[in-house]
Swiss-Prot record:
Gene name in the database record: TPS-(-)Bphell2
Species name: Pinus contorta (Shore pine)
Protein name: (-)-beta-phellandrene synthase 2, chloroplastic
Residues reported to bind Mg(2+) 1: D375, D379
Amino acids binding Mg(2+) 3: D527
Cofactor binding note of this UniProt entry: Binds 3 Mg(2+) or Mn(2+) ions per subunit.
Length: 624
């Protein structure tokens, strides 16, 4: 048995804490705290086992999750060492960046350039795609824009607009590889391109067709068609057809071609696609299979590896800082909750790979960890009386109320209070205004959403699917994991623009619904075993009598598939006031959580996939 004793905050100097951040617009009385019972203060520590229900010395019955806890050796994290911050590596990276910029700039933007007019369009697209997939595109934003502006001139021309493009501006015929790569890349960068260009690659029966010889060139063309099809918007039938055709073609090709860098790339993309494909994991894969036949290709790969390892040095320091924070607030002693701070840091560093985005990575990891701890408290461990006290304490936002909480909640409350305040100050440096009141309102809405679910569990009530989804998309905590991190990104977000990306704006609402639905399809059995009957699966079955679990999951997955297309549109639609960097960060948060749910629940217990992600993107540098 493990003893829960969270006392590191009891000795904290409360005189240092005041409540200057009280919401002036809200005057609330919180009787649960005013009438805080003395017996709560004197409650003994709680002994927890791995069974479904336990009791402590005063007879309180509790449910606990059957989790295996911290999967990572703290001594290993503390001892992580790297030499990639040495000046020689930084200097080499700078040299390689300049060499690649020279390559970009040597293309020019005029028709009289040195690059062959028979390949100039594809070469530009290939260069942009390569630096993005290798994770080094932040160095070449101006060069990328110039290259894509050039390609778009021809993609949108009267001749090519309906047919697609050839490999070069003077190509006599259209090319599937160039057109698919162009459609994907231009769309992701906000250029108005239509998927109708793919109609030109169908036969007279309206079916996509290829030669059947399956040359490497043809396979790569279909691979880029597959990649493009994943960036579909609602109602794009040709993109649906392209996804079906390319998936079948590539699976068939894998059975015929020899094991090679191409086959490895195909296997990876078929497995992770786009919506479950963490950028840093793809970068590691791509640098391992990237061709190195020319000096230029060798420089691209070398820069990618050097940058990967320089960032690895920064990850080491940030992860050690996060672990100190985790220990300071007594989280290791909370044996009823999941200890997955390392995993959450990994997720953050997989989607925010610019070294300057340290505040984003750490804030994301901490907010995600809070959501996990509170989920375990509200759904499993806490009593109704304790949950009401904690809910009231969050609304009060005052460190003095910690005395009214049971022992195991004290450290959690102070961690939330301190960290949210700290991140609000960090955001103020970027936003030029205090965002704490806004963030507190988000926390109130979030914490309130837990109480109906706790009552459902207590009473055995099973809501309708819509009733469940309306509440659970808030309690899932997506808004909490997104809001404060994006406020630190360096982009000013005035209140009216922030509301276009924050809940309940459609963009944020879609992310919340997608993750709630996908998460439930992976977790509902384990949740049910802990006494949590309500899930999107069980509620959908309630609304549709006679439906099997398998059928319900199939329909929910179909919902997610369609919602992802809506999310694509919300991300890439024109005339949006929200900076694309902020939308992309929120979108990538959806991708990384979706990655964790791809095959099973990657959060209840670290799966092979999650462990692999931590090792390949955080713990292990790339061999040079």
């Amino acid at each position: 048995m493990a003893l829960v004793s969270v006392a590191p905050l009891v000795s904290m100097r409360r005189s240092l804490f005041s409540s200057p951040y009280e919401l002036k617009s809200i005057d609330k009385t919180i009787p649960n705290l005013v009438m805080c019972r003395k017996r709560m203060l004197g409650r003994p520590s709680i002994r927890v086992s791995s069974t479904a229900s336990v009791s402590n010395d005063d007879g309180v019955r509790r449910r606990v999750g059957d989790y295996r806890y911290n999967h990572w050796d703290e001594d290993l994290i503390d001892s992580l060492a790297t030499s990639y911050e040495a000046p020689s590596y930084l200097k080499r990276a700078d040299t390689l960046v300049e060499a690649i910029k020279d390559r970009f700039n040597s293309m020019g933007v005029d028709d009289g350039e040195r690059m062959s007019p028979l390949t100039d369009l594809y070469q530009r697209l290939w260069m942009v795609d390569s630096v993005e997939r290798l994770g080094i595109d932040r160095h070449f934003q101006n060069e990328i824009k110039s290259a894509l502006d050039y390609v778009f001139r021809y993609f949108a021309s009267s001749y090519w607009k309906e047919k697609g493009i050839g490999r070069g501006r003077q190509s006599a015929v259209t090319d599937l590889n160039s057109t698919a790569l162009g459609l994907r890349t231009l769309r992701l960068h906000g250029y108005p391109v239509s998927s109708d260009v793919l109609e030109n690659f169908k036969d007279h029966n309206g079916q996509f067709t290829c030669s059947g010889i399956q040359t490497e060139g043809e396979i790569r063309g279909v691979l880029n068609l597959f990649r493009a099809s994943l960036i579909a918007f609602p109602g794009e039938k040709v993109m649906e057809e392209a996804e079906i055709f390319s998936t079948m073609y590539l699976k068939h090709a894998l059975q015929k071609i020899a094991v090679s860098s191409l086959s490895q790339e195909i296997e990876y993309l078929l497995e992770y696609g786009w919506h479950t494909n963490p950028p840093r994991l793809e970068a590691r894969m791509y640098m391992e299979v990237f061709p190195q036949d020319t000096i230029y290709e060798q420089k691209l790969v070398e820069l990618a590896k050097v940058e990967f390892n320089i960032f690895h040095s920064l990850q080491k320091r940030e992860l050690q800082s996060l672990t100190r924070w985790w220990k300071h607030y007594g989280f290791p002693q909370l044996s009823f909750t999941r200890h997955i701070h390392v995993e959450y840091y990994t997720f953050g560093s997989c989607i925010a790979t610019d070294p300057k985005q340290s505040a984003f990575r750490l804030c994301f990891a901490k907010m995600s960890y809070f959501v996990t701890v509170l989920d375990d408290i509200y759904d499993t461990y806490g009593t109704m009386e304790e949950l009401e006290l904690f809910t009231a304490a969050i609304k009060r936002w005052d460190p003095s109320v910690v005395d009214c909480l049971p022992e195991y909640m004290k450290g959690v409350y102070m961690a939330v209070y301190d960290t949210v305040n700290e991140m609000a100050k960090e955001a103020e440096k970027v936003q030029g205004r205090d965002t704490l009141n806004y963030v507190r309102q988000a926390w109130e809405l979030y914490i309130d959403a837990y109480m109906p679910e706790a009552k459902w569990i207590s009473s055995g009530y099973l809501p309708t699917f819509q009733e469940y989804l309306d509440n659970s998309k808030i309690s899932f905590g997506t808004r909490i994991t997104i809001l404060q991190p994006i406020l630190t990104l360096g982009e000013p977000l005035p209140h009216e623009i922030l509301q276009e990306i924050d809940f309940p704006a459609k963009f944020n609402d879609l992310i919340s619904v997608i993750l709630r639905l996908k998460g439930d399809t992976r977790c509902y059995k384990a949740d049910r075993a802990r006494g949590e009957e309500a899930s999107s699966v069980s509620c959908y079955m309630k609304d549709n009598a006679g439906l099997t679990e398998e059928d319900a999951i199939h329909r929910i997955n179909a919902m997610v598939h369609n919602l992802l297309k809506e999310l694509n549109w919300e991300l890439l639609k024109p005339d949006c006031n929200v900076p694309i960097s902020c939308k992309k960060a929120a979108f990538d948060i959806c991708r990384i959580f979706h990655h964790g749910y791809k095959y099973r629940d990657g959060y209840g217990d670290a799966t092979i996939e999650t462990k692999n992600l931590v090792k390949r993107t955080v713990l292990e540098p790339v061999p040079l």
